[in-house]
């Protein structure tokens, strides 16, 4: 079962019984109870009252989700309707109890779902079970809109497409990109944040999932940045073949052979160059150097890209970066070769890693950092104890890394005067 499939199984199974399986009302593919209601909260704080109402979004870009906060007390006790659908599972809803503390609503029971209010009046949701971590950003919607017959919802931010100079089979390639930005016309400073791999590369169903990080988007948009999440060739809705270092038999997934793996990284770097060049031409993007970052494979690509194109880059955010996991005996060779390319960047970079990462141990990642510094690289390395011992999920915990990122932005002069 794929990681997305496992995650969806967990999030449905954890709802337990009893739950509704017959849709009282259907919003696209998500059932909600016909008697859903929202009671106007009385004599509660402004923060508590902001949770009240209906919210819509998607777990992992695939599992549609509706949360209805039906009532909330002055002490933070709430009753919610939790509903999901899509991704090949039968839509379900259930009424659950929840608790609000500060700006976070946590569903009680054993559900492991938390919703954090953002300054943009959205909910940043995180679901955790074992090493499965799901993320979603939920937008507010009037319950009356959901209750209309035949109601439909815009579940995710619409994608845009970048024209590139890439071609395959004589046909031009367009790359999908998710854009998050502040209100207004800008221009805004640009962060390009790059996605990782698909686990072992053996499940083609994962190739078409569009990646965007609500944590990164919320953090930077609040600070006045436009954030772009480009999808490389064959990923998400981008054109072309996903071909980042596969074995000769693609069913075997990513190859540990450096002769196949490193050309795959070069292909990914070509895609990033095309995306960056196209994004810098936008009227809402400020002239000048950009920030570049990424998670996992996207992290090492960001470091390498900065070394290859230092004239474009102001700073680099590397979250748990690496190209091949330590399950490959060639991991040190492959990862070291890519991080070494970043040494020519010269400016400060930020390396953020979680302890007990099942792909990249702290020892391995610090060794990569040493290789980078010996090649002339400049940076700081931080490690964090991620809850549950799932270090590769560090990005889902902005409470751990946001302070270090803000300090880094101050150091490189990337924070605009407030």
Predicted features by range, described:
Residues 186-188, 196-239, 325-326, 358:
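Short substrate-entry loop that stabilizes the transition state in hydrolases
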Residues 245-282:
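Alpha/beta-hydrolase active-site loop
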Residues 194-196, 353:
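The conserved beta1-alpha1 loop
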Residues 145-186:
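N-terminal cap/lid segment of alpha/beta-hydrolase-fold proteins
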Residues 270-341:
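Primarily recognizes the serine-hydrolase "nucleophile elbow" in alpha/beta-hydrolase
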Residues 315, 321-377:
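The feature captures the conserved acid-bearing segment of alpha/beta-hydrolase catalytic domains
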Residues 375-418:
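C-terminal catalytic histidine-bearing segment of alpha/beta-hydrolase fold enzymes
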Residues 24-146:
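Central antiparallel beta-sheet cores of small beta-barrel/beta-sandwich binding domains
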């Amino acid at each position: 079962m794929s990681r997305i499939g496992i995650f969806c199984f967990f999030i449905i199974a954890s709802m337990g019984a009893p739950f509704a399986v017959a849709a009282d009302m259907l919003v696209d593919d998500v059932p909600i109870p016909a008697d859903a209601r929202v009671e106007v909260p009385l004599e509660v704080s402004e923060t508590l009252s902001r949770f009240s109402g209906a919210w819509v979004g998607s777990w992992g870009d695939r599992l549609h989700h509706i949360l209805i906060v039906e009532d909330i007390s002055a002490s933070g006790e709430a009753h919610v309707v939790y509903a999901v659908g899509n991704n090949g599972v039968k839509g379900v809803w259930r009424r659950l109890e929840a608790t609000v503390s500060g700006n976070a609503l946590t569903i009680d029971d054993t559900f492991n779902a938390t919703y954090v209010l953002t300054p943009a009046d959205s909910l940043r949701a995180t679901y955790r079970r074992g090493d499965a971590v799901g993320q979603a950003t939920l937008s507010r919607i009037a319950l009356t809109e959901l209750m209309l017959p035949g109601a439909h919802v815009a579940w995710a931010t619409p994608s845009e497409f970048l024209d590139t100079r890439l071609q395959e089979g004589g046909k031009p390639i367009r790359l999908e990109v998710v854009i998050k930005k502040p209100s207004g016309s800008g221009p805004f400073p640009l962060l390009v944040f790059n996605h990782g791999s698909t686990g072992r590369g053996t499940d083609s169903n994962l190739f078409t999932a569009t990646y965007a990080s609500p944590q990164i988007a919320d953090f930077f948009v609040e600070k006045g940045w436009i954030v772009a999440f480009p999808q490389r060739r064959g990923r998400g809705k981008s054109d072309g073949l996903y071909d980042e270092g596969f074995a000769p038999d693609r069913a075997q997934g990513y190859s540990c052979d450096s002769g196949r793996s490193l050309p795959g990284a070069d292909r990914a770097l070509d895609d990033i160059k095309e995306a960056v060049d196209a994004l810098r031409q936008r009227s809402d993007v400020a002239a000048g150097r950009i920030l570049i970052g990424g998670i996992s494979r996207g992290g090492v690509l960001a470091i390498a890209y900065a070394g290859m194109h230092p004239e474009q880059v102001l700073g680099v955010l590397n979250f748990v970066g690496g190209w091949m996991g330590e399950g490959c005996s060639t991991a040190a060779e492959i990862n070291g070769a890519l991080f070494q390319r970043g040494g020519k960047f010269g400016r400060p970079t930020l390396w953020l890693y979680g302890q007990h990462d099942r792909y990249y141990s702290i020892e391995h990642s610090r060794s990569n950092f040493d290789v980078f510094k010996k090649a002339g690289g400049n940076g700081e390395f931080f490690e964090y104890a991620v809850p549950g011992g799932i270090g590769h999920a560090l990005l889902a915990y902005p409470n751990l890394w946001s302070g270090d990122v803000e300090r880094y932005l101050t150091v490189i002069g990337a924070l605009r005067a407030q």
